[in-house]
Swiss-Prot record:
InterPro entries: ABC_transporter-like_ATP-bd, ABC_transporter-like_CS, P-loop_NTPase, UvrA, UvrA_DNA-bd, UvrA_inter. One of its GO terms (biological process) is nucleotide-excision repair. The keyword Lyase does not apply. Pfam families: UvrA_DNA-bind, UvrA_inter. It comes from the Bacteria. A zinc finger (C4-type) spans 253-280, 740-766. The gene is uvrA. This is UvrABC system protein A. GO terms for cellular component: cytoplasm; excinuclease repair complex. Gene3D superfamilies: 3.30.190.20, ABC transporter ATPase domain-like, ABC transporter ATPase like domain, P-loop containing nucleotide triphosphate hydrolases. The UvrABC repair system catalyzes the recognition and processing of DNA lesions. UvrA is an ATPase and a DNA-binding protein. A damage recognition complex composed of 2 UvrA and 2 UvrB subunits scans DNA for abnormalities. When the presence of a lesion has been verified by UvrB, the UvrA molecules dissociate.
Length: 943
């Protein structure tokens, strides 16, 4: 079959569509956010492809696999087995890294186990077991007639007089020994000091190097090795300072006897006890109680609560501090930061062995005096954390814990034996820390010889190929040691994509969700080439995408619309880019042809040169002591290639610092910096990201935006409700009273089917309406609470027109383009872009002071050109009210409308971390060293 034929697809908002998709082509599905793209690609095509494959397995095997729900579709023909590559972050397991996900680390373990050279950590000499023949050949290669002696070390750096050993050597017929570097006669050995360490080496043979000595040397080496237990030394007789040759017949260091077991791949695994660092168990980090977190506010006194739980309200611990203050003569009422550093150290870390007189008052008012050392607040917390059985105490103490690199392995996660195995001059931790681009260069240049080259040939081929695939999808800036939980959705998706290319499957249907997220325009071409390569292997590649380059590169485009939600779900246009542009109904076509576009502002908002937010000396991750200046009251875009340090600078440094200072929240961790000034221009900071607005089906836009409370109050105010004594809680489906108890307000019942997918059936008591009959008898303007929750935002806006408090919130949801979502729609069904816009609308509906700092990370994710246009209008409106907007973005339509740009680079990873350009878009476009400028310039010059 040449096509995939879909007949009567009705999943979610799809309107009974019939569609023919060409097989073995690159197909892009595009359309407004919420128009039904994911419903078609993931919930119909992928779900059915996956379901058919799983159903071909035995019932026993099926119970171990998560089955997809059968999509609401009449028929699909021509489907292949389906693989979906989504944006979900890969893993929350701290042991999962880029290297382990891509399986490159497994090949590296094998490589080091087979061709690695173990070394002694103290003497840096290779641990190689040598044969007697190799030892003899080495000695015979020395200059002819060199006067040498062969020594057998019998005592190495051991205390004692060693009388018995010296007598024993002499009894065996040996005449001389080198004791502590001096040649001595064994007939009259020196008396050795009992408490000093000594080294005794027996002189087994003295000789001049000649070619006919081979047999004699072999016998002498045999004697020396037997005497010493496997070690022999060859030294010059006339020059005691000359370098000595040390030989070992064991797999051990000839100097100190350090040895390792036979190298196996598991020795290099931090997930295996054989290879994991014993101190941190292979996690690379250690938890500790952090003084910066414990001292919540150093400007106030200990009595006033500088340390939570140790102030005057907590009598037991406060008594300790007052006794401590009496002993060391400091004032518990003084600001903590004014106390001498020595006193602060004692308070935190304890008094050591020094005993202090503590006065304790018991419940009866009796004073008890006890003398003992003070353990210190940090040690006290660590002990209680370990000993307590109370979860609430443990959770409270955990707020003071931070992570730091393990002191033993330095964050490499491996035990010393594994860290000291080298290929050339490089060990495994060094390779894991390099960027993927640098690692590829290292392995491309690596040349092994002889037997090692033969052993490593296939392993190196696999490593190089996998690294090349990661570089091809624009991930050259990541390192193999990067923890999987720190990856963005786009990065995780591209790693999966690279792994799939490595698998080299043919005849598969790949379904991808916006793989260009987080990618700079510069890297887009490489990503598209990767998708084309997947197609050329003989696969059908279906991509949900809004990126213009991807749409133009597609063999076939499907435009879903015309609107979003209930207004979408139809195929508006399909064909190649030229055919889409000619279709008058296609919104995408209008943007591609230039008939509709996002305009460049006629003039930029004026800069107030006196008002700046200045962050100095930011040095987290790859940032190179960056000084960031953001103009207050403007719309600033932070740009730069993937991995240049944008997220570290804004999300890991600026946002937590501003949050700690302005929002009075729990202290959050921030990356290292020197100083920050200008926060006085703001009264709050808000981070609007794409994380879900709620993780349970009970959470919905009405509850998140605060709409549901006034709606419930309205229903409770209806005369009938007042007559029955119903309060607003009666109209909540989360608490007993008004909800249907058969389904506990869910509206559906879950039926577990074991080796079939779980089935959700409407509750037979409330028929899916979530409330009991009595509650549904209350009507406001003829509608029940269930009917109101089932309204779209647009319908509700009209219905509640006379209630300003509700109408204003609904209007902001419409302003951000969410007129189509239902008030009671489960938040788990919202896309990332929709969740972000619900948050944006919630902020917009609040009374505005004009002094808010808004931070957004790639707000255009999941948004169509038309959605972006609407989003920009909202952001510009916030800016016009005096607020400051900081956006991390790659989308050129957003960048060109910014008032100010901060461009990081020049490259990703270690090649980035610097500010390359700042200024208006027109000023930045002139900077030749900026990759962003190269793509921005032609757009600004377009008529």
């Amino acid at each position: 079959m040449e096509n995939i034929d879909i007949r009567g697809a009705r999943t979610h908002n799809l309107k009974n569509i019939n569609l023919t998709i060409p097989r073995n082509k690159l197909v892009v599905i595009t359309g407004l956010s919420g128009s039904g793209k994911s419903s078609l690609a993931f919930d119909t095509l992928y779900a059915e492809g996956q379901r058919r494959y799983v159903e071909s397995l035995s019932a026993y095997a099926r119970q171990f696999l998560s089955l997809m729900e059968k999509p609401d579709v009449d028929s699909i023909e021509g489907l292949s087995p389906a693989i979906s590559i989504e944006q979900k972050s890969t893993s929350h397991n701290p042991r999962s890294t880029v290297g382990t996900i891509t399986e490159i680390y497994d090949y590296l373990r094998l490589l080091f186990a087979r061709v690695g050279e173990p070394r002694c950590p103290d003497h840096n000499v290779p641990l190689t077991a040598q044969t007697i023949s190799q030892m003899v050949d080495k000695v015979l290669s020395l200059p002819e007639d060199s006067k040498m002696m062969l020594l057998a070390p019998v005592v190495k750096n051991r205390k004692g007089e060693h009388v018995k050993i010296l007598e024993n050597i002499a009894a065996q017929g040996y005449i001389r020994a080198r004791i502590d570097g001096e040649i001595c006669d064994l007939s009259d050995p020196p008396k050795l000091a009992l408490q000093k360490k000594h080294t005794i080496e027996v002189v087994v043979d003295r000789f001049k190097v000649r070619s006919d000595l081979a047999t004699r040397l072999a016998e002498s080496f045999e004697t020396a090795l037997e005497l010493s237990g496997g070690t022999a030394i060859v030294a010059e007789m006339d020059n005691p300072k000359a370098e000595e040759l040390v030989f070992s017949a064991n797999f051990a260091c000839p100097h100190c006897g350090y040895s390792v077991p036979e190298l196996e791949p598991r020795l290099f695994s931090f997930n295996n006890p054989a290879g994991a660092c014993p101190t941190c168990d292979g996690l690379g980090v250690q938890q500790y109680f952090d003084e910066d977190r414990v001292v919540q506010n150093p400007t106030i006194s200990l009595a006033g609560g500088a340390v939570k739980g140790w102030d005057r309200r907590n009598f037991y611990y406060y008594q300790m501090l007052t006794s401590l203050a009496k002993h060391y003569h400091f004032d518990v009422e003084a600001p903590y930061e004014s106390l001498p550093k020595k006193i602060q150290h004692i308070i935190m870390h304890g008094s050591g062995k020094e005993e202090i007189e503590f006065q304790y008052m018991n419940d009866r008012g009796d004073v008890v005096i006890r003398k003992h050392p003070f353990e210190g607040i940090l040690n006290n917390m660590a002990r209680r954390y370990k000993e307590t059985e109370s979860m609430s105490v443990r959770e409270e103490l955990a707020k003071n814990i931070s992570n730091r690199p393990c002191i033993d392995c330095g964050g490499s996660r491996l035990r010393p034996e594994a860290r000291n195995v080298y290929i050339g001059r490089t060990n495994l931790p060094i390779i894991a820390e390099k960027s993927i681009g640098e690692t590829l260069e290292f392995f491309t240049a690596l040349s092994l010889t002889g037997q090692k080259a033969q052993i490593a040939e296939k392993i190196l081929k696999e490593i190089r190929e996998r690294l090349q695939f990661l570089v091809n999808v624009g991930l050259n800036y990541l390192s193999l040691s990067r923890s999987a939980e720190t990856l963005s959705g786009g990065e995780a998706q591209r790693i999966r994509l690279a792994s799939q290319i490595g698998a080299g499957l043919v005849g598969v249907m790949y379904v991808l969700d916006e793989p260009s997220i987080g990618l700079h325009q510069r890297d887009n071409e490489r990503l598209l080439n990767t998708l084309i390569h997947l197609r050329n292997l003989g696969n059908t590649v279906i991509v949900v995408e809004h990126d213009e380059d991807a749409i133009r590169a597609a063999d076939h485009i499907i435009d879903i619309g015309p609107g979003a939600g209930v207004h979408g779900g139809q195929v508006i246009a399909q064909g190649n880019a030229d055919e889409i542009m000619l279709n008058p109904n296609s919104i995408t076509g209008k943007f591609l042809s230039g008939a509709d576009k996002i305009e460049i502002p006629k003039k930029r908002t004026a800069l107030d040169k006196k008002k700046w937010l200045k962050l100095k000396g930011a040095s987290g991750n790859n940032l190179k002591n960056v000084n960031l200046d953001i103009p207050v009251g403007l719309f600033t875009c932070v740009t730069g290639v993937s991995g240049s340090g944008k997220s570290t600078l804004i999300n890991d440094t600026l946002f937590p610092l501003a949050q700690n200072a302005l929002n009075r929240a729990e202290k959050t961790d921030y990356a290292p910096y020197q100083s920050i000034e200008g926060l006085e221009h703001f009264d709050k900071v808000i981070d609007i990201n794409q994380s879900p607005i709620g993780r349970t089906p009970r959470s919905n836009p009405a509850t998140y935006t605060g709409l549901f409370t006034p709606i419930r109050e309205l229903f409770a105010g209806v005369p009938e409700a007042r007559a029955r004594g119903y309060n607003p809680g009666r109209f909540s489906f989360n608490v007993r009273g008004g909800r249907c108890e058969a389904c506990q307000g869910d509206g559906v019942l879950k039926v577990e089917m074991h080796f079939l997918p779980d089935v959700y059936v409407p509750c037979d008591q409330c028929k899916g309406k979530r409330y009991n009959r009595e509650t549904l008898e209350i009507r406001y303007k003829g509608k029940t609470i269930h009917q109101v929750l089932d309204m779209t935002v647009e319908e509700a806006r009209e219905f509640f027109d006379a209630i300003p408090m509700i109408a204003r919130k609904l209007q902001t949801l419409m302003d951000v383009g969410l007129s189509y979502i239902r008030l009671g729609q489960s938040s788990t069904t919202l896309s990332g872009g929709e969740a972000q816009r619900v948050k944006l609308a919630t902020e917009l509906s609040k009374r505005d002071t004009g002094k808010t700092l808004y931070i957004l990370d790639e707000p255009t994710t999941g948004l169509h050109f038309a959605d972006i246009k609407q989003l920009l209008e909202v952001l510009h409106r916030l800016r016009d009210q005096g607020n400051t907007i900081v956006v991390i973005e790659h989308n050129l339509d957003v960048i060109k409308t910014a008032d100010w740009i901060v461009d990081l680079g020049p490259e990703g990873g270690s090649g980035g971390g610097q500010i390359i350009a700042t200024g208006t878009p027109e000023q930045v476009a002139k900077v030749t060293s900026s990759h962003t400028a190269r793509f921005l310039k032609p757009i600004l010059e377009k008529p």
